[in-house]
């Protein structure tokens, strides 16, 4: 009994001692009194717990290419970690700061973020893509050119319109006194005088006049420069040209003799001789000087016969040609006028072109392109020359020898044309015969009745035999004549 009492006393003493020891350990003021061995044991326990529960690293990427590291088992040891962190914070606050322990820590760069994120590259923007006026120089040039073209179109069109109206106002009284109808546009069934020009396009104006003796009508065409076209304006700076007035008078057949005659600048006559069908056939000689008739050196003459030249170059005509030689491009009278030569891809045409008795005048407007409305008054005497030429062509008559020579020239031209087109006409006739035979054979083959088909074949055979017999008879007659 005494022994049992002694054992209980010992247990109580031991329990009180151990409880006092743990109470002292929880007090924050007495942490420093314990040895480092106690903390070493605690660190060993923590290392063992870390090695026993390895953690897996999970890396997730969001839209901004940032990486996040998640540790598995974090929730399980969250409470223990907070307690350890509090304990370590208390330790670091009480322990002195050691400079050697953290030496080089601040100088070590943080490479974890650079490994996880892509490097940022800055690209230099080209100069032509930057927002500056220099980036739009091509667009500026295009807009400027377009505006210049539009402005030139408006100005050029208006100037041509003013020139045409100025010409008409100057010549209207003279035209109305010589023609019953002035300005028919051809839109009405009955000829009506509109009293105004007909605009074909921005640089060509037409005027039709009729109702005068000895002529069917007169077509006046004002051919201005293409002032509405900027490219044409730039081209004229290198090579100036003039506005032109072309007048075409269609004569009645009974009021004009058979002859071809032309007078004008030497350059214009050479060009017309190459282009016009009648001048190339009836006036094959080179242009001759008009000094014999008192014409200036700038003008030359093309004539079918010398009699025509003597008859046309009277005093008044020479006066017009001499005083207005700078404005006259060409004067062309012809009973065989058919226009420019017909150029066909396959040889000559099979028939002669239709001809008209025509008087053709071409005048240059003064100014060499720098024309003003007041310059149109200088062309009024040339219109008087046109009216005089109409009356002169009606009065002029060839003598007997001249008519015979003119008829021979026209027969010669027709014969030469038939010789040139003989082979082509034979080929055309052969092709027509073959086409006719082919159509007849197709008609026989398409016949459903055998008896009718046989009769058609026999009729075709008889026709071929008759043609062959006629051909043989002609050959025999030719041989007899040759003998």
Swiss-Prot record:
Cytoplasmic side stretches = 21-135
Lumenal side of the membrane: what ranges?
Answer: 156-483
- Basic and acidic residues biased stretches: 105-118, 430-472
**Residues forming coiled coils:** 451-481
How is it placed in the membrane, per its record? Answer: Single-pass type I membrane protein
Under the heading InterPro entries, the entry gives: CCDC47
Please list the residue ranges that the record marks as compositionally biased, kind Acidic residues.
Answer: 60-104
Biological process GO annotation list?
endoplasmic reticulum calcium ion homeostasis; ERAD pathway; multi-pass transmembrane protein insertion into ER membrane
The record's region (Disordered) falls at: 46-118, 424-483
Cellular location(s): Endoplasmic reticulum membrane; Rough endoplasmic reticulum membrane
**Molecular function GO terms recorded:** calcium ion binding
Give the UniProt keywords, A-Z: Coiled coil, Endoplasmic reticulum, Glycoprotein, Membrane, Signal, Transmembrane, Transmembrane helix
Please list which residues make up the signal peptide. Answer: 1-20
Task: Establish whether keyword Transport is in the entry.
Answer: no
Looking at the UniProt record for this protein, which Gene Ontology cellular component terms does it annotate, in alphabetical order? multi-pass translocon complex; rough endoplasmic reticulum membrane
* Chain ranges passing through the membrane: 136-155
Q: Where is the composition biased (Basic residues)?
A: 473-483
Residue positions with a glycan: 178
User: How would you summarize the oligomeric state and partners of this protein?
Assistant: Component of the PAT complex, composed of WDR83OS/Asterix and CCDC47. The PAT complex is part of the multi-pass translocon (MPT) complex, composed of three subcomplexes, the GEL complex (composed of RAB5IF/OPTI and TMCO1), the BOS complex (composed of NCLN/Nicalin, NOMO1 and TMEM147) and the PAT complex (composed of WDR83OS/Asterix and CCDC47). The MPT complex associates with the SEC61 complex. Interacts with VCP, HSPA5, DERL1, DERL2 and SELENOS.
Q: Please give the PANTHER family that the UniProt record associates with this protein.
A: ADIPOCYTE-SPECIFIC PROTEIN 4-RELATED, PAT COMPLEX SUBUNIT CCDC47
Function description: Component of the multi-pass translocon (MPT) complex that mediates insertion of multi-pass membrane proteins into the lipid bilayer of membranes. The MPT complex takes over after the SEC61 complex: following membrane insertion of the first few transmembrane segments of proteins by the SEC61 complex, the MPT complex occludes the lateral gate of the SEC61 complex to promote insertion of subsequent transmembrane regions.
Family statement: Belongs to the CCDC47 family.
Q: What is this protein called?
A: PAT complex subunit CCDC47
Q: Which gene encodes it?
A: CCDC47
